[in-house]
C-alpha cells in the first residue's frame, strides 16, 4: 500500500463526534465524488474502498441513512473495483443536500458544489472539509522523501474554494492546472505565517501517522 493509501486508511477510521464536522466532511466527499442523476438519485462513486466506507459511516451517523455499497469492476483498462452508494428516496436526498449546503450544477452532469461557507465557519469544520477532500482525491508523499500534499479538483471554482479554506490556516496552498483538472497543492519549503498545524485527524483523536499534519514553520 502506498503512503497516501495508509494515510487514507487511517483517516477513514476516524469519525468526528461533532455533527457539524461530519456534515462538512460529507459535503467535501460529495463535492468530489457525488452527483444527482437524471432520476433525482444521489449517487456517490469512488475507486477507493476506504473512501466509500467513510461515506457510508457518515451517512449512518449524521443522517441516519442505511444504504448498501454496490461494487463493480472498473470498465477502464486498469484493474480494480468501482464502489457506488446511491440514495433514491427523495426526502433523504433533500435532507443530505440541505444539510451539506450543496447545490446541483445541472449543466455539469448534476455535480455538486458548496453553496456558501456556512458549513466551514469553525476551524474544526474547515479541517473536516479538507479531510474529506483529501480522502476523495488527494495524495501525500512520505515526508522523509520530500514533502508534497495535493488534492485534485474537478473545476477551478472547487479548487479556489478549497485553497481559500486552507489559506485560513495561513498555509500557502496554490493551484495548478493539470490534465484538465485543477490541483490544490502544498510543497515542502512553503512559508507559513502561523505555527498552527493543519491536522487532518479528527479533533477527538490523536493522529496515528504524524505526516497527516501539514508542516508548520
Set out the residue ranges of the language-model regions.
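N-terminal, positively charged regions that mediate nucleic acid binding
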Residues: 1-41, 45-55, 59
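DNA-contacting interfaces and partner/effector-binding or oligomerization modules
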Residues: 46, 53, 57-77, 84-211
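Conserved alpha/beta core segments of nucleic-acid transaction machinery
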Residues: 213-217
Amino acid at each position: 500500500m502506498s503512503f497516501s493509501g495508509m494515510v487514507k486508511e487511517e483517516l477513514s477510521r476516524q469519525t468526528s463526534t461533532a455533527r457539524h464536522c461530519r456534515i462538512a466532511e460529507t459535503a467535501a466527499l460529495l463535492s468530489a465524488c457525488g452527483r444527482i442523476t437524471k432520476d433525482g438519485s444521489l449517487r456517490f462513486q469512488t475507486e477507493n474502498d476506504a473512501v466509500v466506507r467513510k461515506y457510508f459511516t457518515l451517512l449512518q451517523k449524521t443522517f441516519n441513512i442505511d444504504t448498501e455499497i454496490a461494487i463493480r469492476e472498473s470498465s477502464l483498462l486498469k484493474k480494480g473495483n468501482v464502489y457506488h452508494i446511491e440514495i433514491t428516496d427523495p426526502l433523504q436526498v433533500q435532507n443530505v443536500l440541505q444539510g451539506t449546503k450543496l447545490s446541483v450544477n445541472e449543466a455539469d452532469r448534476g455535480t455538486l458544489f458548496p453553496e456558501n461557507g456556512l458549513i466551514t465557519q469553525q476551524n474544526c469544520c474547515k479541517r473536516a472539509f479538507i479531510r474529506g477532500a483529501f480522502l476523495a482525491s488527494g495524495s501525500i508523499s512520505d515526508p522523509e522523501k520530500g514533502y508534497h500534499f495535493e488534492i485534485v479538483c474537478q473545476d477551478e471554482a472547487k479548487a479556489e474554494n478549497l485553497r481559500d479554506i486552507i489559506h485560513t490556516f495561513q498555509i500557502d496552498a496554490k493551484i495548478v492546472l493539470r490534465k484538465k483538472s485543477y490541483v490544490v497543492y502544498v510543497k515542502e519549503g512553503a512559508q507559513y505565517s502561523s505555527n498552527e498545524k493543519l491536522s487532518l485527524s479528527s479533533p477527538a483523536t490523536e493522529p496515528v501517522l504524524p505526516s497527516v499534519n501539514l508542516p508548520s514553520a
